[in-house]
Structures are given as C-alpha cells and as structure tokens.
Amino acid sequence: MPYKISRAAYAGMFGPTTGDKVRLADTELFIEIEKDFTTYGEEVKFGGGKVIRDGMGQSQVTRADGAVDTVITNAVIVDHSGVYKADIGLKDGRIVAIGKAGNPDMQPGVNIIVGPGTEAIAAEGKIVTAGGMDSHIHFIAPQQIEEALMSGMTCMLGGGTGPAHGTLATTCTPGPWHLARMIEAADAFPMNLAFAGKGNASLPGALTEMVLAGATSLKLHEDWGTTPGAIDCCLSVADEYDVQVMIHTDTLNESGFVEDTIGAIKGRTIHAFHTEGAGGGHAPDIIKICGQPNVIPSSTNPTRPYTVNTIAEHLDMLMVCHHLSPSIPEDIAFAESRIRKETIAAEDILHDIGAFSIISSDSQAMGRVGEVAIRTWQTADKMKRQRGRLKQENGDNDNFRVRRYIAKYTINPAIAHGLSHEIGSVEVGKRADLVLWNPAFFGVKPDMVLLGGSIAAAPMGDPNASIPTPQPVHYRPMFASYGRSLTNSSVTFVSQASLDAGLKGRLGVAKQLVAVKNTRGGISKASMIHNDLTPEIEVDPETYEVRANGELLTCEPATVLPMAQRYFLF
C-alpha cells in the first residue's frame, strides 16, 4: 500500500516537486517546478538509512557496462529550456543523462545507472544551473579568474595581456606572440578560457595571423580606431575563418555615426558590446543597433540595473578606465557624453522585453567580474517590481522571466561565440560545467561549482575541524583546481584554423584545445533564446529619450536592491 506524505514533508526529504514554488534569493522572483522526472516512491538519496546502498538504489553494474561516474540527485534544474526536477548523470566529464537514477535491477524507469563506482552529490532542495559564461573579459589580473569561478562562472572570453594600458581599456590580446603567452597561461587556471585578438586594421594580414595563432574572436575597440574601414576588414576576416567579432563603436562620432557603422557592418553577424552606450559607443544613439537583425546586443554589468548611484559611479570609472584626465575639459566632455540616465533606464526595459540578449562583466574595466549573475537577477527583480509579470508567463510564477534572464549569461553568449556545442545549458552531451545553489543564496553564493564533472570550487570550513562546516567558512579551490585534474577538467577554446595549423603541437599546452564553430551567417539575433526581439529604436538627440516601436522606454532608478548588503555583511 503506498504511503502518503505531505508536500512539506516530501520537500524536506527529496526537495520540491511538480507544482511547488521556490523563491530565488531575496528577490520577488518565484519559480514553479513544471515537471518531475524522478519516480514517487523510487527516489534515490544518499546517506545513512537512505536509498543509494548496495542492493537497493546502487546496482552491481560496472562503469564499463554503463554506470555513471557521478549522480546528482533530485535537483531542481533552472535552464533556458525550463524549470524541472530530475537526477543528473555525469560520465567522462559530460552530462550523459537527465531523468531517473537508481538500480535498474530493482527500480523501474531508470536511465541513470548508479553503481559501486558512482559518486553522489545530494541536490535535494538545491538548484542546478549551467555554469555561466562571461563574454566581456579584460584579462587585467589573473586573480579575476578565481573571483569569477567562485561566483558561478565557468567560461571567460575576452582579451588582454595583464595590466598593460591597452588591456586596461580594450578587450584585445594583440598579435600571435601575446596570444601564445595567454594560451600557455591558461593551463594554470580552473576555467574554460577563450581569447580575442585585436580587430582594428584596414588590411587583413595582421588579423589573419591572430586567428591562426588561436584567437576565437576579434575585438574592434574605439581606442584603437573603430573606423568603417576597420569594421569591414575585420568582419571579412571573421567570415573567412568562422570567428566572432565584438565591437565597441566610436563614441565621439569622429569617423562616422551609428548609421555609418551599420552600413560598414553590411548585415553581417556581430556582437555589440555595452549596446546602451555607457561603456562606449556612438553618443547618444548607439542603443538603436539593438533593433538590427544581425546585431547581437549585450550589456556590461555596471549599468545593471539602473539605480540612484549608477550615474555618479560611472563618471569616475570612465576616467580611470580610458586613461582620461579630470584636468582636461575635453576628457570630461568625452566622459559626460557617454553617461546618460535616459538610455540606462531604457536598457532595463530592453532586457525585460528580450531585445538585449547577453549580460557580461567588463572585468576591472568598468565592470565587476564576480557580479554577472547578481546584476542579471537584480535587473529581473527590478523589472518585475516595476513592470509586473510578463505576458508570456503560464501560471502564477515567474518561470518565463527566469528562463529569459538565465539565458543572458549561459546559452546566448555560448551561441554568439560558437561554444554552444560544448557549454551553455544543462543538456545531455554537453560539458558537465554545473553550479549548485541553495535557493536562499541563488545567484549570489554558489554551493558548489563543477568543471568537466569534477568539483572545482566550494565554500569550505576550517580544514583542521572534525567536520567540514566550522568557521571560518569561505570559498576555496577544490581538487579540480589542482595538478593534471585542472588541465583535464577545463579547456581552452581556439579557432579551427589554428588547430588545423598545428597550434597544439607548437605550444605544447596541457589543456585540450577546442574549436569554436558557427559564429557567422549561421547565427543572428534570431538565435538568441528568449532574447530575440528587434524593435525599431529611436533616440531623441536633445533629451536622450528612447522609444521602441514608438513607445517611450523609461523607469525609475532603484533605491534598494535584493542580493546586496544582506548577503555581504561578513
């Protein structure tokens, strides 16, 4: 006779199930479990007196015969594809199955075999997401990588060589020699890394040699001269070698206006950084390119979301990041032309309607590398409070809004940069780069970060204590952050052309080099999941007011945010 159990007792034992709701951190965002792929009465759980024991939930199946390396039990999966409950099976560093784990000799419907060689990660009451991807990195300091990892990022793409002045301002690793040094350095870090070459040139030769040296993308930056000629040349090289182009346009409109940039792009796919403009770009109307079907627009996190402190903070950041002087009037005018409350307010709404597709950091160069997830969810929370539920919601929950916003730092940057065959979602066949969260700390402080199926980072107590929990508890590197486990748990992304040219043998690096693919004509704004809207944008040149399809986009700045001081008092 089946035993009946209350929802509260069930959630306490196995985590929430279909129809249960979970609050994300201290936001006003509530998810509802859409489907539970586990089987009532046959759930697997590890621990004393629990199910994953020999002859019960654990089978006699060997690894060679199909048992997984790791099972993550009873996880609430939050992904662009949905909000659902399942067990997750990992093998050879990849997700091999999502569904029902256990012993097929004893239990029905098992598609994840637990054997004597299987490790268990208990996710009852926890949320599992794909590791985040930050697609706007200035590699100024290697210490950024640990900060990003501990915040739930598992892939970083950008450029730089350290605290050189070119890197402080622009996201470029210029030239084959510097690219080689950065790819070599990548072997030291528990993180999937990808490097962008400099894209500013009017002739293709120097750009081609950077792609052949391993650049996964080319970055056009106004500080190097983003002229129509450089834009056209860079995109032509990218089309030839299947790499992405990122653009930071001409704030001063010296070589042309936004219309000239759109003309130089010629309908080709391009990733537009900080499309609102505070991070740089044609003043005051670069934001209008988010309506172009070939432009993938993104934000950097200092303007996310619009608050009472945003404007004042940006002026100081800008002076430092772009080597400007407060004693030079022209430099002050340059800074003030970029910081506009009207376009920043509109950016909030453009994210909420799915017209802006990606959120990234702009690490140490007008952005905070450890706050990509936090700023994304703060924006989502602000928009729910100010604009209410989205019309696409089905039921009394925020599932669609949550799926829209998580796509902005997982699957969409992966698609934009040709990495979605490897990362970006909780999906069978992809790398097991996964993050576990306590719902109360969702988006703020992860419970555990996995890279390639191995634990790379987690909060950990005093190593001399008798149990793992005594203070001081803080984030520490785990075993996938050391030795050959590090180089076997993460990869370095490069261009296919560089692999064909023998880059791996030439550099002798330990990490696997994986090629990016499908970054050009095969993708566009329409490829951005839940974030593919292309409204017609108008900007008033006098007032800076922004309209989308004729509707004024404006909102009040936030005075209080969730996921903030409450979580960082200690």
Swiss-Prot record:
Entries under SUPFAM superfamilies matching the protein: Composite domain of metallo-dependent hydrolases, Metallo-dependent hydrolases
Record-level Gene Ontology MF annotations: nickel cation binding; urease activity
Binding site for Ni(2+) 1: H136, H138, K219, D362
Cofactor binding note: Binds 2 nickel ions per subunit.
Subcellular locations according to the entry: Cytoplasm
Cofactor section: Ni cation
Catalytic-site annotation from UniProt: H322 (proton donor)
Quaternary structure annotation from Swiss-Prot or TrEMBL: Heterotrimer of UreA (gamma), UreB (beta) and UreC (alpha) subunits. Three heterotrimers associate to form the active enzyme.
Name of the featured protein: Urease subunit alpha
Naturally occurring in which organism (per UniProt): Rhizobium leguminosarum bv. trifolii (strain WSM2304)
Gene field: ureC
